[in-house]
Amino acid sequence: MRALTNLSQIATGEGRSFLSGERQADVKVYENHSILIHGGRIAEITRAVPPGVEEIDCGGGVAVPGFVDPHTHIAFAGNRVQEFYMRIRGTSYLDILRSGNGIYRTIRDTVNADENRIFKETISRVWSAVRRGTTTMEMKTGYGLDQRGEEKILSAIEVIKNTGPISVVPTYLAHVVPQDVQENAYVEGILETVKRNRQRISYADIFCDAGAFSPEASRRFLEAAIAMGIPARIHTNEIENVGCVKKTRGLPIVSYDHMIHFDDADLDIVKENGSSVTLLPITVFALNEAYPDARRIIDRGIPVSIATDISPLNMNDDMIFAMHLAVRNNHMNAEEVLNAATINPAASLGLAEKKGTIESGKDADLVVLSARSYDEIPYLYGLDIVSMTISRGNILYSRGDHGITDTSEA
């Protein structure tokens, strides 16, 4: 047994399911307690550490649950640096896509890479996320286009899931329709790939938006995946509102992701479907779009998660930066974003029984931060405040100096 000691504060949501509405802001705070860890799980939150227990001095910092990143495109090869400058000069996302670049560029790079290269580039990014406090990550396919390419990405994800440092949730993503290919025929093909790999994936996802799949094709794909017993997610309303949410009425979709452009009727359907919303504020930052108002979603009783959406478009794996943007621009408070980065995404990924909160019996997935209080986390977004990342009781990253970041004299 070991104990995390000298913690000024432990802050966590509670429970084994989504927190929504007013409860999304419920955070339990322990002052000057220790966390006992045994067998990779949280044994107890206590004031008194038993004798003979290995003590890990946390330097007066704050412990929160390990961050759960529920939406990533981290598995790919290559980069899109030229597109970054094109967007800065005013070229739109859709114009880049229609020219055969954007997602199509990454598809070409990834299809031409072998599995080992995809693995090496991806695991490097995973370790970067670990240093920023992430202990669980959803990873999508989507850059392979055909069965062979998607299975190559999925194999790289599986290696990371089985041998890597963090918990991984594989998702099959129907990303875009190949140029000069008929949409209905392509959907038939990808459904065969999903069927062939249904034991290897935890979720099925589709990008329903301008320049991607139509609402009709998206519903067909989602219905088929659900019929196979695969839970469904959806990318939607990122570029435009083309009616994707309305087309999903009655489907048990776990999470509607992006949701930049929505109306009240869309939120009614999300609520009726018993679904959640995952906001991706770093992507909005990268696209220089207007941020959606999370208050409209939370106040309807819909649970909200946040994610990094790390991808070649958005090379950022920092959940703390996502929390900062969600407070600053999506109008969430410190308590809501803490739960949006921990328990709610854990519930979104079907892991809330064992992850997402600091409670006895759950996995010891923890982040120790050089702060005095959890509400400083979004505020200190630009500083190196992650002092320790722990996954299932194993210390994955330790900065060594666990001292408090002092901003009191500024």
UniProtKB/Swiss-Prot annotation:
Zn(2+) binds at residues 71, 73, 235, 309. Keywords: Cytoplasm, Histidine metabolism, Hydrolase, Iron, Metal-binding, Zinc. Binds 1 zinc or iron ion per subunit. One of its GO terms (cellular component) is cytoplasm. One of its GO terms (molecular function) is zinc ion binding. The keyword Transit peptide does not apply. Pathway: Amino-acid degradation; L-histidine degradation into L-glutamate; N-formimidoyl-L-glutamate from L-histidine: step 3/3. Transmembrane segments: none annotated. It is found in: Cytoplasm. 4-imidazolone-5-propanoate binds at residues 80, 143, 175, 238. Its cofactor is Zn(2+); Fe(3+). It comes from the Archaea. InterPro entries: Amidohydro-rel, HutI, Metal-dep_hydrolase_composite, Metal_Hydrolase. Fe(3+) binds at residues 71, 73, 235, 309. Catalyzes the hydrolytic cleavage of the carbon-nitrogen bond in imidazolone-5-propanoate to yield N-formimidoyl-L-glutamate. It is the third step in the universal histidine degradation pathway. PANTHER family: IMIDAZOLONEPROPIONASE, IMIDAZOLONEPROPIONASE-RELATED. This is Imidazolonepropionase. It comes from Thermoplasma acidophilum (strain ATCC 25905 / DSM 1728 / JCM 9062 / NBRC 15155 / AMRC-C165).
